[in-house]
Design a protein with these regions (language model features):
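N-terminal helical cap/lid subdomain that shapes the substrate entry/recognition surface
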Residues: 2-115, 128-130
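Asp-based, Mg2+/Mn2+-dependent phosphohydrolase catalytic module
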Residues: 1-15, 27, 42-47, 106, ...
Length: 240
């Protein structure tokens, strides 16, 4: 694929999180909903785990189709349930084993930083920033990030242009042609980033559920089988 910004130097590489920096895991969503239900306080309509499962599906479907962001609180609201944030520890404990950073990430980001490339993250998420930062800190990655955007804090989700523009702002780059976006999803990541003028790298690690696949498929500028190979792709573009 020919990239229209070939003469523009690469200044930043922005990564998707789930399925890219963190390997994709198939999880039991019914079990996830039971863990989430542990934060419910008071009475609510019907069986709380089932209602929360349906609410989460609706929230993520809206994110996919309308590119509207959401938070964990929005899932409870959609379910008609009240929750206590201090009781979310069971839900977080459920997810923690699935948040481990890919072993390639630390050396990859370190090499990019040595080369003077800015590094960022753009993640479609309902989780608070603090959770993501704690996971990155646990794995020794947080200090390597120049900026990060978590869509739980902004109005739109990938592939909306505003999400990518916010990520550019976070890493201090104004020209999308100077950015490379790395992700595992052809719609949210590749199509969305290409649409704003970024160069793209697909890391096809994820077996994405059909209900999460968007209506459009993007064409990446490069495809790599592991994150470590992203460095060579970026280096070749910087040398061109």
């Amino acid at each position: 694929m020919t990239w229209l910004g070939e003469s523009t130097p690469v200044e930043a590489v922005i990564f998707d999180w789930g399925g890219t920096l963190t390997p994709w895991h198939d999880v039991d969503y019914a079990e996830e909903s039971r863990a989430l239900a542990a934060a419910v306080v008071g009475e609510g309509p019907g069986d709380a785990p089932q209602v929360l499962l349906e609410a989460a599906t609706a929230v993520w479907t809206r994110s996919r189709d309308e590119h509207v962001s959401a938070t964990l609180a929005d899932i409870f609201t959609h379910a008609g349930l009240t929750h206590d944030e201090d009781l979310l520890h069971a839900y977080r404990d459920f997810w923690e084993p699935h948040t481990l950073t890919d072993p390639d990430v630390l050396p990859l980001l370190s090499r990019l930083k040595v080369d003077g490339v800015r590094v960022g993250v753009l993640s479609n998420t309902v989780w608070p920033r603090a959770w993501h930062e704690e996971f990155f800190m646990r794995d020794g990655v947080l200090e390597l990030l120049d900026g990060a955007v978590y869509t739980s804090e902004v109005p739109g989700t990938k592939p909306a242009p505003q999400a990518f523009e916010a990520a550019m702002d976070a890493v201090g780059v104004t020209d999308p042609a100077a950015c490379v976006f790395v992700g595992d999803r052809l719609f949210d990541d590749i199509w969305g980033a290409t649409n704003v003028g970024m160069r793209t790298v697909l890391v096809p690690h994820s077996d994405i559920p059909a209900w999460q696949v968007g209506h459009s498929l993007g064409e990446p500028d490069a495809v790599v089988e592991r994150l470590a190979h992203v460095y060579d792709v970026v280096a070749s573009w910087r040398a061109a």
